[in-house]
Curated annotation (Swiss-Prot):
Transcriptional regulator. Ni(2+) binds at residues 78, 89, 91, 97. This is Putative nickel-responsive regulator. Keywords: DNA-binding, Metal-binding, Nickel, Transcription, Transcription regulation. PANTHER family: NICKEL-RESPONSIVE REGULATOR. One of its GO terms (molecular function) is DNA-binding transcription factor activity. The keyword Transcription regulation applies. The keyword Transcription applies.
Length: 138
């Protein structure tokens, strides 16, 4: 892979903050940190397009005592068998459960799945985190 060198201009204060954070995170140099920022920018664009294949996790916390939440969660996971790769179930306490669902598919479809799961009655909190499949990322 050919590497291209280019210059970046920015205010000194901004660069100082960037350098501080870069060091805290353990980057060896600015180039590595900037490459990660550019990759993240590309991945976010893929999500926004909606037609690119993405991967991600849907994390939900729910009260398993709530009427039909467990049945609905399982039914929905079977409805999206092509996109839902795996799930992890954790008992947080005697009433609350944490479910981490690993998904892969078109961004728009993954968002729809997350919205449906998170909006179920009995779900106390939910979050979708999407990333790239890595196929189109350099």
């Amino acid at each position: 892979m050919k590497i291209i060198r280019f210059g970046v201009s920015m205010p000194e204060d901004l660069l100082e903050k960037f350098d501080t954070i870069m060091e805290e995170k353990g980057y060896a140099n600015r180039s590595e940190a900037i490459r990660d920022l550019v990759r993240d920018f590309i991945v976010r664009h893929e999500w926004e397009e909606g037609d690119k294949e993405v991967a991600g996790t849907i994390t939900i916390v729910y009260n398993h005592d709530e009427a039909d939440v467990v049945k609905e969660l399982l039914d929905m996971q079977h409805d999206y068998v092509n996109e839902i790769i795996s799930s992890l179930h954790v008992h947080m306490d005697e009433h609350n459960c944490l479910e981490v669902i690993v998904v892969k598919g078109k961004g728009s479809r993954v968002k729809t799945i997350a919205e449906r799961l998170i909006s179920l009655k009995g779900v106390k909190h939910g979050k979708l985190v999407m990333t790239t499949t890595g196929k189109e990322l350099v």
